Amino acid sequence: MARKTKLEDYRNIGIMAHIDAGKTTTTERILFYTGVSHKIGEVHDGAATMDWMEQEQERGITITSAATTCFWKDKRINIIDTPGHVDFTIEVERSLRVLDGAVTVFDSVAGVEPQSETVWRQADKYRVPRMCFVNKMDRMGANFYRCVDMIVTRLGAVPLVTQLPIGSEAEFEGLIDLLKMQEIVWKDESLGAEFEYRDIRPELKEQADEYHAKMVELAVEMDDAVMEAYLEGNEPDEATLKKLIRKGTISRKFVPVLCGSAFKNKGVQPMLDAVVDFLPSPLEVERMQGIDPKTEEPDTRGASDDEPLSVLAFKIMNDPFVGSLTFCRIYSGVMTTGTGVLNSTKDNRERIGRMLQMHANHREDIKEAYAGDIVAVAGLKNTTTGDTLCDPLKPIILERMEFPEPVIEVAVEPKTKADQEKMGIALNRLAQEDPSFRVSVDQESGQTVIKGMGELHLDILVDRMRREFKVDANVGAPQVAYRETLTKRAEIDYTHKKQTGGSGQFARVKIVFEPGEPGSGFQFESKIVGGSVPKEYIPGVQKGVESVKDSGPLAGFPMIDFKATLMDGAYHDVDSSVMAFEIASRAAFREGAQQAGVKLLEPIMKVEVVTPEEYMGDVIGDLNSRRGQISGTEQRGIAQVIHANVPLANMFGYVNTLRSMSQGRAQYTMQFDHYEQVPQAVSDEVRAKLA
């Protein structure tokens, strides 16, 4: 089976936006006009094709990124739907990894919102070329020009305006195409499928000329020869302009800005044209960086069917009909059903069973997938999010994704005995799909604890457990994920001896325990020379410390940011074993922790509140009362932005306080920043609660 679409005709794009900016509606319209869905699904009725999980339909927010493929002007567009809520930024990051370009959707009334900035910064991190679509031009208070200003002031980007709106709010009837210098006006009765080009009306001519000139001036900077000709009075034609805008977009010198109203079916087709004209094909983005697992040397893969196979698994979903589906982006080579591949991240083999190409609501079985494709593979046993699949003879590990640590936890208990077993299965499935979600069982109380990125994140996971797996559970109040660490250095020399007829147990270890840098986690080093502890026993020493560090001596929280160095030891030819060294290092750690002293750490969140000026004093006062430290304030348009670091323990239920304090006008976002020592009074309180 040969490749159907040339690689240069692929566009792998994501649609990024703040909640409610109209991302799902925009995606729906794209699928409608590219001929995939026959009836437009409205998010308002909860029937959009992209939002295929029941919950998303109820909450009207998009949670899982479904990958959909469609065609426009003979180009294949693969759309990865990204979630827009801050609790799901991990999914956004993951989808940004596999995109080549993105369309950022803004609400023309709200402009650039906090979450849009978060997502924009993530897209900068992965160097994703993007364009902007200013949506909802038909709403009261729509203001395209203010939105363009905010792209400069809030995102620090350079907007290249390629369209102007004709009218706004109820008067919004179409756009001026600044490349063709013509109006595009839609016929209402044809659901936006029909539109016509007309001459620009006289009253808008002056403004159109002004913006056209600005656009040309920015575009010609991409090519010296065109620039010279332009300065001599020769204006570039439309085809040349498109080439220059494409070049500037892909090199991230500027972002094309378009406008429309997806809900009113206006502006979607020109946006699709812009995706094809300005966003890169897999051939135009940087080669994928990776590491050769055999040599640990850097290696790369380019978009070509002839290079060795390299594939990134970026999402796992459970499908009621097919079971577990792993969404994959093929960077190089060809993947065929029935063949074996290497999961280089975990160093084990996988067999490619069934491959599916996902359309908005149906799926098509395929036998081969080529470089640039995004496919879903059924039945992979050990592959999780972020793993690389590759040619076993030419292995590569594509750059690893970094997942933030979960900071909030709740205890969940099944309501009935029957739910008990189902809950275990459900939680494991969910943890497999979402690396920012962890499940653990408290050894002492036997309680199951789930950990995630925020209150909404955990709400949704519990909800999915109920719907998808039919598990009813009681959920405790959210708890803070405290940690413990050492306060100073301690050196422990410990000997473990046990003699009971026959062979006994013997191990002696001398270990230095010391505090590490913040964020360093747990480090283990062996400085054994001359074999005072044989090589094969050293992993036992490390394992011993690891087995007890998850339950600290102070209040039973995991210990972080410390280092254990094995300095010396002794063994016995008959009585020593890995087990004996494990027991010795465990006891040494307990003694060391006691001697070094242990302190309690709490997660500090980076909080950003955007509020109208008049509530600023109240907001700052309230943050201070939550043990918050204000790190700065800035003016953003008419609003004030307050940056603060606040302990997570004091942020529960903050959203309600903020709403009532600002009459619903202020919003906030928060993400984990670092761990910090807890004040003594709070530490005593936490320990008393646990006791």
From Swiss-Prot:
UniProt GO cellular component terms: cytoplasm
Localization in the cell: Cytoplasm
Predominant localisation class: cytoplasm
Short name of one Pfam family: GTP_EFTU
SUPFAM superfamilies reported for this sequence: EF-G C-terminal domain-like, P-loop containing nucleoside triphosphate hydrolases, Ribosomal protein S5 domain 2-like, Translation proteins
UniProt GO MF annotations: GTP binding; GTPase activity; translation elongation factor activity
Domain tr-type G, first and last residues per copy: 8-283
Keyword annotations: Cytoplasm, Elongation factor, GTP-binding, Nucleotide-binding, Protein biosynthesis
Function noted in UniProt: Catalyzes the GTP-dependent ribosomal translocation step during translation elongation. During this step, the ribosome changes from the pre-translocational (PRE) to the post-translocational (POST) state as the newly formed A-site-bound peptidyl-tRNA and P-site-bound deacylated tRNA move to the P and E sites, respectively. Catalyzes the coordinated movement of the two tRNA molecules, the mRNA and conformational changes in the ribosome.
Family membership: Belongs to the TRAFAC class translation factor GTPase superfamily. Classic translation factor GTPase family. EF-G/EF-2 subfamily.
PANTHER family in the cross-refs: RIBOSOME-RELEASING FACTOR 2, MITOCHONDRIAL, TRANSLATION ELONGATION FACTOR G-RELATED
Protein name: Elongation factor G
Taxonomic lineage of the native organism: Bacteria, Pseudomonadati, Pseudomonadota, Alphaproteobacteria, Hyphomicrobiales
